Amino acid sequence: MSEELKSLIQPHIDSFDFFTDHGIDLVLKDSEPLYFEHNSTQYKIRFTDLKLSRPTRNIVEKEIKLYPNESRETGTTYNAPFKGAIGLYEVNEMDEMDDGTEVDYNKQEPTHTFEVDLGRLPIMVKSRYCHLNGMSPEKLIESREEELEQGGYFIVNGNEKVVRMLVMTKANHPVALHRKAWTNRGPGYTKNGITIRCVRPDRSSITNNLHYINDGQTTLRFLYRRQEFFLPATLLLKALKDTTEKEIYENIVQGDNENTFLTDRVELSLREQKINNINTQEEVLDYIGSRFRARTQFPPSFSNIKIGRWFINQFVFVHLPNYNDKYNLLILMIQKLYAMVGGKCGTDNIDSPAFQEVLLAGHIYGMILKEKLTEYLESTKSFVLKSFEDKKKSGDKLPDALKKVLDKNFKIADRFSYFLATGNLRSSSGIDLQQTSGFCVIADKLNFLRFISHFRSIHRGAFFATMKTTAIRKLMPESWGFFCPVHTPDGAPCGLLNHLSSNCLVTVDAAQDPTVQKAQTLLPSFLAAHGMLPIDMVSVYQHQYLTITLDGRVLGKIEPKAGEEMVKMLRYLRSMGNEPSIPKTMEISYAPPTNVENGQYSGISLFTTGARFMRPVVNLTSGQNELIGPQEQLYMEIAVVPHEVIKGVTTHIETSPTAMFSLLANLTPFSDYNQSPRNMYQCQMAKQTMGTPLHSYPFRTDNKLYKVQNVQKPIVHTKNQFKFRCNDYPHGCNAVIAVISNTGYDMEDAMIINKSAYERGFGHGSVYKNEYIDLDQGLSRFEQKKTFFGRPNTVVDELDKFIDTDGLPFVGRLIKPGEPYYTYIRPSDGRQVTKDYKGKEEAYIEDVRIIFGPNGATRDPSKINNICVKLRFNRNPVIGDKFSSRHGQKGVLSQLWPEINMPFTESGMKPDVIINPNAFPSRMTIGMLVEILAGKAGAIHGKFQDATAFQFDENNTAIDFFGEQLAKAGFNRFGNEQMYSGTTGKEFECEIFFGVCYYQRLRHMVKDKYQVRALGKVNALTRQPIKGRKVGGGIRFGEMERDSLLAHGASFCLNDRLMKSSDFAKIKVCKLCGSTLTIYSKKDYSNQTVSECKSCKSSDSIATISIPYVFTYLVAELAAVNITMKLQVS
């Protein structure tokens, strides 16, 4: 098992394991009860238990293990039973404590408990709850999986679906921003604000915004049921702590009394709150509770103070349960906001990875579950109350009514299946996300590299794709080593869809790592012992002191010089990994004090949460590998290569200069010799290559699978080719290549292939397609489950050549369009019905699968009604098929040239591929020239060549290194050879560049795309040919094509294309009034058809003209809006 390969997909599996092992329990613990009244008694209901099993299927009343491949082959979902329990409680006095202590529901016994079936929850392959977890490669092959199966995806309706990673704002970190939209929040609101995304232990989050108002006041905004609410910050400070105005003033100003900008605003904010005459904490909580009471579902017995506390617990800094911590964080945010407005610090860049983390599959699962549990209870409550309004059922007892309702309620797990199948999120609250669609994609198994790339891709979000600004797409310096600078698509998603670099890790949640949990408790006392002044010791510090925060909790203050020393010590201890207070995955972000305008707000921020980016570098002090985060990287001195190290300045060095690239970008040979866009194109084309997506072809029922028959390992490869086991899934062939302009068939990037090389198998491929045939589809309910495959008329139907005696097609047979495909017995009259093959091209029947019912009860061979047929289509190269080298040099096959006419070298070698030398100068893909050289040397000496980037430089050149190898074998050191014409046998005047290059065959093939039609379907409205290759449509003759014919003056050709071959029509028109709408045909006394103009009352002035039919449609549409159009007919 490849550990490196496993690490690429690990974040997905870790997040799902967090959901199953901890997330479900945390969601249950944090889920809110729902209150309602019945017979003047207050009740509440809440979930008391949630239980997830492992995937099983039911066979004749017996549960047996369900393996992923069964779900793939049968087109079903890989899921497990999900059950829960709901408790009904009577609300008593114990619920009404106002002192802020949380009610422990687990100690309260429910009066009734109801077991509920919540459906079947889709399970991630190879997660802890999957049967493949921990299997050896041999066992995986026995289970019909790949030897290198890594999992990380879900199987829904037979398709492999990936929940794509999304960029989120960094958890629990206050970010200073300018947002123009904030000025619309109300009168006096400015564009200045601080935003913080507070994440609870169960990974659900709430975003709090602190706004700056023109007069110097600040307000905190949060969302509740998609509605915005604002709280004045000074009011909230009093609600969080029983304190005085003097203490609040001192906490914010921190002894900086000469800063009148700050002191004036703080005084004004405090004076404004005096007007309300609310002073104590209890009074403030009562005031907040009374304002919000109408919005909540709480019973009247609940006091305002309790409701006020509930609002603060649920919506204000939810990551901090302690009110004192909430108070200190709000003070810090107010200080940062005033510093930004006063010009002491600048805004933070939300587009930089320093202020970003990632949203993973398991975390979004937890968010959805939390919301669906609430929705489940709300629908239960409304149905129960409705049932008591019904006079027939009003006599039912509450537990009986509740049980009836719970049996009919929706299945929570079905919402997850819908989410994975469509990628759409149906949410009442929006769960603090900026999008509702595009969460899931199908994990294409086009080739191995494309499949792996799905797990490393990270999207900025659907909302940003619609934005016109380009700032969000820019490559930030902070993303070095975390996001790949090369691997992003060209076109619309450029810069929005990035890929993690091959060394980038995503941290696991603290709940999954006991060392992190332990460190979180030990760290405050460790820091206090090393120079930090705890925040609660004194209220006034010098304003120059730095604030130390841990995961959004203010721990204390430190003097700036001591702070710098502390950071060095913490990083050293982190690299050594032997101090229990400092976990290896802790990010130590240090922004030093600066006098520069718009610098970063100074402070030390420590992060131990999950879902953050980290990457390894070598700490020069300890000599050990150390994990660093994007926010701390900004102020670190890291050398890329050893000779860049400056003594006394450089503290770290990169593990490798290629560590900044993604897996795919690292596979491009000699990428440092190429122009950057070509490396980008190669990253895209590697993902479109036909290759070896998997080895378990017989057990796969994917909609479409590609396969190239003669694949090889590349002679020239990078270190990652071995490291990530890419040679187990090769996707190309080492071709002998000549760079020569030979026949004229190689113009414009076209390439000539040696016909004999083609006949030997160069580029030969196949496409596998699977077709599900379900006889119950489209039948009435009466006929379903009564229609079966069969062929009773075997003696007389003359179908022995096509169909077997069971009514199914023969495996291995070549089937052509229109030939009999299968037969079945119609239940209404018991007659045999033959269905023909409707495909457009001939195919081989690779295999036929029989799919039994979900319960597996109908295993009778005579009662088969659902099959899956795998068809194999031949896809050998034809003229127009696309090929490419590994340097973005794409071209189409222009001619299969006979070998006897191919140019040859002195040694008798003939090229497999000829390309034009004009492909190189403008594109500057020197890497390809070096590869041809290295490939030639490798082939001659029989050894693989290392083409990892940045290993050659000006002093030690690649040309010398590989040229030496060629010279030793007796070849020209620059790769040129004397060649002779294949047609005349004469020697070419110049030497030809000749060598070996790895070529890929791309999936864009003429057989899949060619489109031709003479006559066919037309649009009913316009009578023009319809579009679409599948439905037999035509190719559009568009505006540009029209313009070129106009420019050529080819009017007859234009007439033919746009009228005769399109919507030619003969229309009657009145010469007098020029109308085409008022002509009316009738029969005269001799039964002859006569046309007459209704407006002119004349039948003599009617003429017939030829015009496109769509013109009459235009005239009718204009007439509908009271515009008449007249023609002048001579």
UniProtKB/Swiss-Prot annotation:
It is found in: Nucleus, Nucleolus. It is an enzyme of class 2 (transferase). One of its GO terms (molecular function) is DNA-directed RNA polymerase activity. Its main location: nucleus. Its EC number is 2.7.7.6. GO terms for biological process: transcription by RNA polymerase I. Pfam families: RNA_pol_Rpa2_4 (PF06883), RNA_pol_Rpb2_1 (PF04563), RNA_pol_Rpb2_2 (PF04561), RNA_pol_Rpb2_3 (PF04565), RNA_pol_Rpb2_6 (PF00562), RNA_pol_Rpb2_7 (PF04560). A zinc finger (C4-type) spans 1070-1096. One of its GO terms (cellular component) is RNA polymerase I complex. It catalyses: RNA(n) + a ribonucleoside 5'-triphosphate = RNA(n+1) + diphosphate. Keywords: DNA-directed RNA polymerase, Metal-binding, Nucleotidyltransferase, Nucleus, Phosphoprotein, Transcription, Transferase, Zinc, Zinc-finger. Three distinct zinc-containing RNA polymerases are found in eukaryotic nuclei: polymerase I for the ribosomal RNA precursor, polymerase II for the mRNA precursor, and polymerase III for 5S and tRNA genes. Belongs to the RNA polymerase beta chain family. DNA-dependent RNA polymerase catalyzes the transcription of DNA into RNA using the four ribonucleoside triphosphates as substrates. Second largest core component of RNA polymerase I which synthesizes ribosomal RNA precursors. Proposed to contribute to the polymerase catalytic activity and forms the polymerase active center together with the largest subunit. Pol I is composed of mobile elements and RPA2 is part of the core element with the central large cleft and probably a clamp element that moves to open and close the cleft. Component of the RNA polymerase I (Pol I) complex consisting of 14 subunits. This is DNA-directed RNA polymerase I subunit rpa2. It comes from Dictyostelium discoideum.
